[in-house]
Structure formats: structure tokens, C-alpha cells
UniProtKB/Swiss-Prot annotation:
Cofactor(s) for this UniProt protein: Mg(2+)
Motif (DXDD motif): 373-376
A GO MF term: ent-copalyl diphosphate synthase activity
EC nos: 5.5.1.13
Entry keyword set: Chloroplast, Isomerase, Magnesium, Metal-binding, Plant defense, Plastid, Transit peptide
This protein's name: Ent-copalyl diphosphate synthase 2, chloroplastic
Transit peptide residues according to the UniProt entry: 1-70
Classification via SUPFAM superfamilies: Terpenoid cyclases/Protein prenyltransferases, Terpenoid synthases
UniProt remark on domains: The Asp-Xaa-Asp-Asp (DXDD) motif is important for the catalytic activity through binding to Mg(2+).
Summary of the tissues where the protein is detected: Expressed in tassels.
Similarity field: Belongs to the terpene synthase family. Tpsc subfamily.
Function: Involved in gibberellin biosynthesis. Catalyzes the conversion of geranylgeranyl diphosphate to the gibberellin precursor ent-copalyl diphosphate (ent-CPP). Involved in the production of antifungal dolabralexin phytoalexins in response to biotic and abiotic stresses. In response to fungal infection and in associtation with KSL4, is involved in the production dolabradiene, a type of antifungal phytoalexin.
Amino acid sequence: MVLSSSCTTVPHLSSLAVVQLGPWSSRIKKKTDAVAVPAAAGRWRARARAQDTSESAAVAKGSSLTPIVRTDAESRRTRWPTDDDDAEPLVDEIRAMLTSMSDGDISVSAYDTAWVGLVPRLDGGEGPQFPAAVRWIRNNQLPDGSWGDAALFSAYDRLINTLACVVTLTRWSLEPEMRGRGLSFLGRNMWKLATEDEESMPIGFELAFPSLIELAKSLGVHDFPYDHQALQAIYSSREIKVKRIPKEVMHTVPTSILHSLEGMPGLDWARLLKLQSSDGSFLFSPAATAYALMNTGDDRCFSYIDRTVKKFNGGVPNVYPVDLFEHIWAVDRLERLGISRYFQKEIEQCMDYVNRHWTEDGICWARNSDVKEVDDTAMAFRLLRLHGYSVSPDVFKNFEKDGEFFAFVGQSNQAVTGMYNLNRASQISFPGEDVLHRAGPFSYEFLRRKQAEGALRDKWIISKDLPGEVVYTLDFPWYGNLPRVEARDYLEQYGGGDDVWIGKTLYRMPLVNNDVYLELARMDFNHCQALHQLEWQGLKKWYTENRLMDFGVAQEDALRAYFLAAASVYEPCRAAERLAWARAAILANAVSTHLRNSPSFRERLEHSLRCRPSEETDGSWFNSSSGSDAVLVKAVLRLTDSLAREAQPIHGGDPEDIHKLLRSAWAEWVREKADAADSVCNGSSAVEQEGSRMVHDKQTCLLLARMIEISAGRAAGEAASEDGDRRIIQLTGSICDSLKQKMLVSQDPEKNEEMMSHVDDELKLRIREFVQYLLRLGEKKTGSSETRQTFLSIVKSCYYAAHCPPHVVDRHISRVIFEPVSAAK
């Protein structure tokens, strides 16, 4: 089961100036606007403002009640959001990216290319075996004399790339001027090693850089600062690391050390060749494999290098392939940016690919690896489980030792991103999955400790706002994460093409981090937001016309109710579901209050709900009364009538049947609310009331689910066909009741910590069971995934509301509903 919307219409978006200069990695976009607000979105915002200013006048004139969605005529005029071609090129381009995935699109590493260029002809002749690699070096020196990532300066990266290229050119007595400029750069910048952040040190730098220095010295490279003070710390680190390398182990079983063999002395190649990866590489490292080829002449090493050189037109990346890494991380980015609905087929293909290469021991960045690591394993586990694949959490036992979790099998260190993705994986645990129940607290405490230390940096990536990503996930776990809140934050955390990964050198993954995803996501968000603003204007009119302020529902309550709906069901094509949720939630709050205050109200409302749509106006009371009972009864009946009219074209059949579904849902809710021992609101403080209006009880949550489902053309809860479906409905109600109870307990100073802990434990168990039923039914492909998504959205919104302080909710409302996303990166 894919827990995402099937709504895939392409939005009407503003034009984007794009220049295509070759492959994805060289895509350049022209940015001219300060704020990425589509022209159409701007028009809708202007219209929303105009509607807002004329609202009171319209009400004064006795205008007809606001419809649940726009009329057919209005929809034809606006054609929201399907008929503009501006988004099509972006969607098509991303689709082409996703379908082009193979072994991974990755930038070239000058360091690794230099090692490949050092391989002499294997037939004993003079010159390099791979002259194309040497050509690449000659063609890619930067203006300052260095080699490396041109857009981001890192002393580690530039120094190791530059020294490697100088060594290779010296080995073949080529380009003395280039070598001189490279050596000049090294001399000018060596001091910067002492100022670099250790977290950004490339993989194996303390081993590889001294090895290159020794190689340079053996080749007679002059003018290199061999005794520079900044090198002393690197030499010391090398001695410590060399002593720690388990030489016997590294020759016996595959370990991550295989990735960094180049320049390492005292290797037993006969034994190491038995540890080659299936593609002939040494843990997918061109540099390590080139070094092995120099020392062994192995045919499989040659084949791997030869294929890679040809693939990248002379250069080679720092690691290859990166197929699993690319497939997994691209899906994650698209989902968090809120644009995955456009690419459901392509995402399904990506996840099928990952599932084919999943193993019970885990995975790493490339298929068929004998070495596994927790970062890719955790990301793949989470996505596979969420997309309906059966995966066992026992895989994480491979990364656990003495109650701690680590990055690679056999190691004992952690990285921020590895623990971050482990924590995300633990959030979708099932009952009894003890390893995930241990991984969750361990990773949470590790990350919170790093946060307190101001150390949420990672050795694998230099991203725009990794601390923001981590803190958001810790504050809003998966079962309390509203999609549009996440997308709004991630749009400011995702750096697009500016995000850089750290391997042996800096590298880029253009199908994971690129500006095309970012541009479409910004446009989509702003476009949906403009529609949401227009809907809110209509909802305010409806709120005023029905006098809901007279029943204790403030306009702020109405806005919060709409926000929960819009942040959960945000797609333009799901306006009917979104507005049904919001209006039902607002009206339910008003009715709940009036049921307690008016003894006669229940009987009158139930009587009216039992009548046929044409009968309720026959009674003299209904026609003549303008009291509070009549006002609220009319509001409920008008809502059910509006929902029925909008849902009839979707359902088909007899409109009377839809009315019956809607009215019976409300009648059942009224009966249960009136009969329940409702101690929640009695004696509540103002603060408690504010929260209680957002956190619904079981009866109201199930009412909202039925309103959403009927508006979507389904009828959740009327006749659940599977035991699992029925259990999901039961658990939804139970979780919502527990959340309501938790909120009230937390606000009562007389309640003790033991009671709060008991409520938390019960809630945790119910959520795990809910997640299990939800995702296991997805694995079986039974029932309606859309209906399960409805219940998930209801649970998430209640969890969010119960745990999120009011001032944070209000900030999210502002960002999600009212503040457009800026184009500034």
C-alpha cells in the first residue's frame, strides 16, 4: 500500500526559465523572482482578498449560503488546476530523471580519476592504461590551480584532489605548467587543514593524504610543503588509525576498509582478491580498485575500471555504483517535498527495484554488497514498509551491540544521518518488534544530545539545514506528522543542487539533490496554498452565515479546524474531502456545546435527521423558529444537503441513499455524544477548551472519517469488509480518546506523573497496533488504501493537535495557509 494520494493532476503553475545543458548534473535555471508565486496563484490570492473585503456586505444582503465547493460554472471558469502547461515540462523532466535511473548519476572525483590515471599499461608498454582518465585531469583544472568541487570550497577536498592530480601528471611527465599551478595552490592553502571541521573530513583522508604525499616524494615532486605544521596532525592521526586497523580481519571478511585500500602498505593481495565485490571492485571504490589493479593485474578489477571510465567519459566517481542510494533517497526527497503524487508509477518502480535487492542482513549504497550500513538500510526499511512491502526489523540486529547501534557491521561509531534515519524507521514499528523499540530511544537520545551540544553535523553530507530536518523529525514523529507542515519546513531545509555529499571527496547526486525538484515543489506548494486561502474565505462566510460564533466556536477555532484538514488533505482535486472534514469538525464543536446547554436540542436534531430531505421543512417549528436550536439544526441539515449534492455525481445512484448515509452518520454521532459520560469539557479551563476543540474524541473522529469518505465517493465504517478494516476503525477511536485523555491529564496539576506515564504507555501500544494493521493490510493489497489513508490522516491530526503547543500550531497555520514559499535558496 502506498500511503499517499492518488491525485496526480498537474497544477497550473507559473512559467520557469530553464536552460538544459546536457545531463541532469549540468542543469542550470534562471531565477528572477524574489518569491516563487505562480501568476495564477497570485490571481487567486487577489480574488481571495477581494472576497474577504466584500464578505460582510454579502452577508448583509442576505446572500445564499456558501456552497461546499465551487459550482460547476465557477470550476469551468477557473479550471483549477489542470490546464496550464507550465508545470508539464518540470513534471516530464523529473519523470525522465526517475525512469533513467540505472547504476546512479554521480559527479566525477578528481582524486579517484587520478588513481585510475596512475595505472600503467598492463601489457608492459609505456604510458597509462587509461589515457582518458589523464585527459580528464588535463581538462578539468580550476582557475586557481586546484582540482575538486568548483562550487564549494573545502580544504580537505581541494587539497587531496589537487595533490592526486599533480602526482598523476608527474608520473607521466605531463603538463608542467598545470603541475606548477597545482603545487602553488597546495602551498598557499595547506594551512587551512588546521582550521577545517573534522566532521567534514572525507572518508579515509588521514590514510589517503599521507600516502599521496609519500608517492609525490618518491616521484621527486618538488615545491610541496612536506614539513608543513598543518600536516603533523594528519600524520599523527594516520599512525593511530593504522594501528587500529584489524589487519587479519580485513583480509578475512568484507569490511568497510576495502573501500580505502589505495596506498595502504603491507597488503596480502592473494587473500584480498577473495573479498572482491561481484562487479570486480573493492567495495565499489574506483581508487581502491585501481590500486588493486596496479598490484595484481586482475582481470575483474580491469573490467570494473574500464566500464566506469567509459561510463563517465574518462573520469570516475568516488564510489560506483550508487543505485540503491539513488533510488531510495530520490523517493524520500520527492515525498518530503510534497510532490510524490505526480510520480506514483516511477516511485513504485523505484521501490520494486529496492525490494529486489533487499536482504535480511541489510543493504548499502549499491546492490550485491557484502558490507552493509545502517543509513541506507534504515531508509530502505522505512520506505519499503510504508509502500506495502514485507520487511523484517530483525535486520537492525546486525547493527546493534550491547544495546548500542552503529553505522557499519563490526564498527562502534555513529553518524548523525545514520541515527536520524534509524529513528525514522523506528517510528513505524509494530507491537513486539523489540529491536526497533530499542533503536528508537537510543537514536532519539543520541540526536537530542547532539542537538544540545550544537553538533548536528554529519560526516556524510553538507546540507542546507540538517539540524532543522533532525529536530523536525524528533518533534513530529511519523504518526503525528502533517504532510503540508513537513513540506513547508522541508522546502526551506532542502538545498536542492547546493547540497553536497562527503565520500573520499565531495560529490553530488543530481537525481537526489537538484533544483528541478525544488522548483516544482515551491510552485506546487504556493499554488495549493492559494486555493486553500480561497477556501478559507468561503469557510469564514459559511461560519458567519450559520452564526457558529453564538455556540462558543471562535473564528480561530474554525481556522485551526480548516488547517488540520488542509495540512492533511491538501491536493487541489480533494477539495470536497478537505472541506467536508473542516466544516464537520467546526459544526461538531458547536453541536457538542449546545447539546450540553439545551435539553431540547437533541430531540429536535435527531427528529430532523430522521426526516426525508423534503420533509423537515414541513413542520411549523422548523419554519417559524429562529432560536438557537433551529439555527444549529438548520446548519447541520444544510451541511448534509450540500455534501450530498457534491457527492452524488461521484457515488451515482439514488441521491436519497447519500442523504441517508450522511444523516445516519450525524444521528449516530449525536446519540453517542449525548449518551457518553462527557467529562472532558465540564469544568474545563480556557486553555483546555482551546486544545479540546482540536483533539476530538472517538465519536467525532469517526464522524469526520465518514464525512470524508462519503465526500470522496466511499462510505467508511458502513460495512467494513475485513477484520483488519474494522480493527483500524476501532483503534482510530481508541487512539483519539487516549489523546484527548492525555491532553486533559497533562493540563491538570493534580494528576501525577504515574498516571501520565500510564496514559503514554497505553497510547504507544495502540499506535503500534494501528500502524501494524494499517501497513499489514497494505502488504496484502486488501481493502481500500484511500480509506486507510483517511483514518491515518485523522489519527495524525489528533496526535499533532494533542502534542503541539498552541503557539506552534498558530505558527504552522501562518506558514502553511498564508505565507508563500520564497524562491531564495
